Swiss-Prot record:
Organism: Stenotrophomonas maltophilia (strain K279a)
SUPFAM superfamilies: E set domains (SSF81296), Galactose mutarotase-like (SSF74650)
Protein known as: Glucans biosynthesis protein D
Annotated HAMAP family: MdoD_OpgD
Keyword Signal appears in the UniProt entry: yes
Domain of life of the source: Bacteria
Presence of the UniProt keyword Nucleus in the record: no
Biological pathway: Glycan metabolism; osmoregulated periplasmic glucan (OPG) biosynthesis
């Protein structure tokens, strides 16, 4: 299956292979309200889950895909969205803790069941599907007409104080997402990415079971375990989720490859970028900007801070940023101005940043960025992940730990000035005839020491390009933001449409003042409108 088809259709393959099989008849309420429990509680911890993943990897992969009843297959988006979960069936609704869990119904794009377990005092018990736990809304489905053992598609978490608004959700393949204090969903994370952006179909691992650990009454953290499976790898995950203004997920994972993996993506972030200040190739919409995030931020092992604005390219674009023991990376939404989006329905200015902080040393590898052309904001066309230099091999155990931060600001910020806007347009000198094609870049920086240098005029822009030539370079104060604007024109080689890598930073007296701004520009082909204006 092609990546675009998968993301649009979300034909997810899930099943119960490798988990203890419990008969549906062995069900009980275990003295709790809500869903029935299947079988007897079994001892469970992260080591147990690793053992399950290891056993999965040692056996041939079996597809988990199932065919849904026709009534569920035929649901449209509005019908599926109208199916709600009843509050009186929420997991832990009768417990004194701060958190509850509710479950997603199968249907629409979500075709295969995921097993759900409740973990209490170190023992796990499977939760039975119950059609009576759902309100079927406008779907046309009546309680009792679906199979009694149908299963669930995923789950979401909410607080006891706000049962109508969830702060994290796990739904579809290995996708999950969360929100900060803004309460607005945006980009997603995944358990794993395999062969993303290559000349062959991408592989999408599935979480085939989740174990939700009942938190203590005073705990601010909820722990979730996930069992992952795919043709290439099986894995065990532990998520310690702490809700707050910036939501934290502390993740430990153990991966067990079935076969060699050519491109393994650790801590993948998945986002959407259609049009923004720097890239208006698809600017046919009435809204000035449409994106979940506007840039990739990197904090390298050597301590350099890098900002790479995102693009909606004409063709699939792949970039790798080689590093050793990275300190962090993430897809960020730095532009928080409603006027720049004008969308009062999906609120792009409130979309969360997602920052990845490695635990321990990750060694050699690269942060890889995949940008895919899109004309549709419902298609996630941006992926960023860590790819280890050493390729995983069958029989290995790969242990990886990291933290994910979801919120308006990442937990780590460069001590230097940072980029707040990147704009592009036709180059040349206003009022003078253009003798050749050039492209203008205007990059705004704020923070660091820039504010105190505004009146001193000692700041210069340092620009490098991999081909072509750079001209009309300037760095001037921008008092509206207490920062500086760097401007320059790039003149591509005559007739060339090869990509050009650009590097920019500001300095004063030999001292670096800003993070490093990187860009990849593709000159337009002959005959393009911007080529005819000189």
């Amino acid at each position: 299956m092609q990546r675009r088809d998968f993301i649009r259709n979300a034909s997810l393959a899930l099943a119960a292979f490798g988990l203890p099989s419990l008969p549906a008849c062995a069900a009980s309420r275990s003295g709790q309200m809500g869903l029935r429990r299947l079988g007897q509680p079994q001892p469970f911890d992260f080591a147990t889950l690793k053992g399950q993943a290891r056993a999965l990897a040692q056996a041939p992969y079996k597809s988990h895909k199932r065919v849904l009843p026709g009534r569920l297959e035929g649901l449209d988006w509005d019908q599926y969205q109208s199916i709600g979960y009843r509050q009186d069936h929420a997991l832990w609704a009768d417990q004194p803790g701060k958190f509850q869990a509710k479950f997603f119904h199968l249907g629409l794009y979500f075709h295969s069941p995921v097993r759900m377990f409740d973990v209490v005092d170190g023992k796990a018990q499977e939760l039975a599907y119950d059609g009576a736990a759902f309100n079927y809304g406008k779907s046309g489905i009546k309680d009792g007409e679906l199979p009694a053992d149908l299963g669930f598609a995923g789950f979401r978490l909410n607080t006891r104080k706000d049962t109508d608004r969830d702060f994290a959700a796990f739904l579809g393949a290995s996708y999950f997402r969360a929100v900060g204090k803004e309460g607005q969903y945006g980009q997603s994370a995944r358990g794993l990415a395999i062969d993303t952006g290559m000349g062959k179909p991408e592989e999408f691992p599935d979480f085939i079971a989740y174990y939700l650990e009942q938190p203590s009454a005073d705990s601010d953290t909820i722990v979730v375990y996930g069992l992952l499976d795919s043709p290439s790898v099986a894995g065990a995950y532990r998520f310690a989720i702490t809700n707050g203004d910036v939501l934290l997920m502390d993740i430990d994972s153990a991966l067990y490859p079935r076969k060699a993996i050519e491109r393994l993506g650790i801590a993948p972030c998945t986002s959407m970028y259609q049009v923004g200040e720097n890239d208006r190739r698809m600017a046919w919409d009435w809204r000035p900007e449409i994106h979940d995030t506007d840039g990739l931020s990197l904090w390298t092992g050597a301590g350099e801070w890098i900002w790479r604005p995102l693009l909606n390219p004409r063709n699939l674009r792949f970039n790798m940023f080689v590093d050793r023991n990275p300190r962090g990376f993430g897809l960020l939404q730095r532009d928080r101005n409603f006027d720049h989006y004008q969308d009062d329905g999906v609120f792009y200015e409130k979309r969360p940043c997602l920052w990845v902080e490695p635990k321990g040393e990750w060694g050699e590898g690269s942060v890889q960025l995949v940008e895919i052309p899109t004309v549709d904001e419902t298609f996630d066309n941006i992926v960023a992940f860590w790819n280890p230099k050493e390729k995983p091999q069958p029989g290995q155990e790969l242990l990886v730990g990291y933290r994910l931060y979801w919120g308006a600001e990442p937990p780590a910020r460069p001590p230097l000035a940072h980029c707040v806007a990147s704009r592009t347009g036709l180059g040349g000198v206003v009022g003078k005839k253009r003798e050749y094609f050039s492209w203008r870049f205007a990059v705004d920086f704020e923070g660091g020491e820039l504010a105190r240098l505004i009146d001193k005029g000692e700041v210069e822009a340092v620009v490098e390009a991999s081909r072509g030539r750079v001209e009309i370079v300037s760095a001037r104060p921008l008092r509206e933001i207490n920062g500086y604007r760097a401007m320059f024109d790039l003149v591509p080689p005559e007739g060339s449409t090869e990509q050009i890598d650009i590097r920019l930073f500001l300095r004063s007296g030999g001292k670096t003042l800003t993070e490093t701004w990187l860009y990849q520009y593709t000159p337009p082909p002959a005959g393009a409108p911007e080529r005819t204006l000189y």
